[in-house]
Each structure stands twice: as C-alpha cells, then as structure tokens.
Amino acid sequence: MRDRLFFLLSKYGIRPRDSIGQHFLIIEDVIEKAIETANVNENDVILEVGPGLGFLTDELAKRAKKVYTIEIDQKIIEILKKEYSWNNVKIIQGDAVRVEWPKFNKVVSNIPYKISSPFTFKLLKTDFERAVVMYQLEFALRMVAKPGSRNYSRLSLMAQALGNVEIVMKIGKGAFYPRPKVDSALVLIEPRKDKIVLNENLVKALFQHRRKTVPRALKDSIHMLGVSKDEIRGIINNVPHSNKRVFQLYPEEVKDIEEYLKKHGIIS
C-alpha cells in the first residue's frame, strides 16, 4: 500500500497539500479496522469524505452497495477516475461541509482534520446508523471527555447529547504520508436512541465561560441570546443546576436549563 501510494504520487506529480489537510493513510490494518468497526455489508450506502488516492474507497466499494465520496481537489478526482473502474462509487466534488450530502446509512472516512468540527456537527444532525471516522487524537479525546474533566467542551456536550461516542483505536503519526504533526484516533459514533436536541445558541453562550457557574456564565453571555441583563435579573439565580460550573453539566442538565429559560420567555 505504501509502495502503491508513492508510485501514484510520482506518476501524477502530486505534492500533498497541507492547506487542505492532505495526509494519505498508508497502513492497511487501519483500513480493515475501520471497515470492520463499521460492519460494512452489501446493503450499505457509505459516505466517505476525502478519498485520497482511493485505498479506503476501493475496499468500501468491494463490500458496500454504494459509496459516495466527497473530494475538493479536482486533480485527485481525475486520478481516481483513471486508476479505478468502480461501478458503485459516485465522486462528488466540493467542500464536504458545504455541499448537500446524499442519503446514506453509514460513514467510513479519514477526514481532513481541518474540517473536524463543522463536519461532526453536520453529521450529528443527519440520520445515519453508524459512523467510523479518523480524527486528530486531541479532537477525539474532547469528543469522549466526561463532564467535569479538563477536556470537556461544547463539542463533548453536543456529541454526547446526540450520539454514543467511543475511541476504537489510537493511530500513530507513521500511519500517514506525509507524516502529520499529531497522533490520530479511529472513532465510532452511533446516534442515541434518546437524542437530546439542545438549543445551540444556549450551548455556545454557556461555554463562552465554561469555568463559571451557570448563573454567572448566563449573565456574562446573555447578549448572545438577544436578551439584556435586565430581562433576566429576576430569574437567573433560580436557574436549574445553578451551583454547577458549565464544564460540569450533563446534556440532560443543559436541557433543564433550556426548558427553564423557555418557560420564562428568554429563548424560544
């Protein structure tokens, strides 16, 4: 696989573009682990983002009913069309965060790390069965961080409100070419059956001051909700979980706060 990559890079005169986060996966075992974790079968319609030179795409095409792969680099698309004769792969050119996604039931992808956050938030709002995605390790650790921990963030809260998230394996820098500056992780995401849909503006407002207590965080960022401090003065100290700091809140507790603010006409 490594030799094949270098052959193709040389054949087509490709220099990986760091500006769009091009790091090509060169370890077959990681590809196999991703496909195994996703439990890919002949009935699946797969979404992939950033196919690179097609190594993961090719294995998905052998096992899935259909593969949609999104690639922003026109030169890479031309190479894929020349090198492979897939009849069940559709290549979509564009920015994966901005283009409309086709219908799919699973995601298997080594995404460009620069789009990790917007890609993940978009994915969590989409109907799917299972996603297996390679992320920067630091990002993955934030996704699975527990309330009260150092890494717990808006990302942690939103990911865990909508999905069950698990780090399947850690991946060293040597699994990619060119070698990235960071370690990676393979992450499994499955939608929660009891999804907690939260007001995103409220979550953003709270996490502007993640180490402050809930009342203080709301007072200091209430303008983000289009409300003045005068409008909340009489109710803010009775907000649910007022003794907690923002980074200690579980998704269910943020929902309690949201419902309280709705009841008092602060948010709709």
Curated annotation (Swiss-Prot):
The keyword S-adenosyl-L-methionine applies. Pfam families: RrnaAD (PF00398). Keywords: Cytoplasm, Methyltransferase, RNA-binding, rRNA processing, S-adenosyl-L-methionine, Transferase. PROSITE patterns: RRNA_A_DIMETH, SAM_RNA_A_N6_MT. S-adenosyl-L-methionine binds at residues 23, 25, 50, 71, 95, 110. The keyword RNA-binding applies. It is found in: Cytoplasm. Its main location: cytoplasm. Its EC number is 2.1.1.-. HAMAP family: 16SrRNA_methyltr_A. Belongs to the class I-like SAM-binding methyltransferase superfamily. rRNA adenine N(6)-methyltransferase family. RsmA subfamily. Specifically dimethylates two adjacent adenosines in the loop of a conserved hairpin near the 3'-end of 16S rRNA in the 30S particle. May play a critical role in biogenesis of 30S subunits. This is Probable ribosomal RNA small subunit methyltransferase A. It comes from Pyrococcus horikoshii (strain ATCC 700860 / DSM 12428 / JCM 9974 / NBRC 100139 / OT-3). The gene is rsmA.
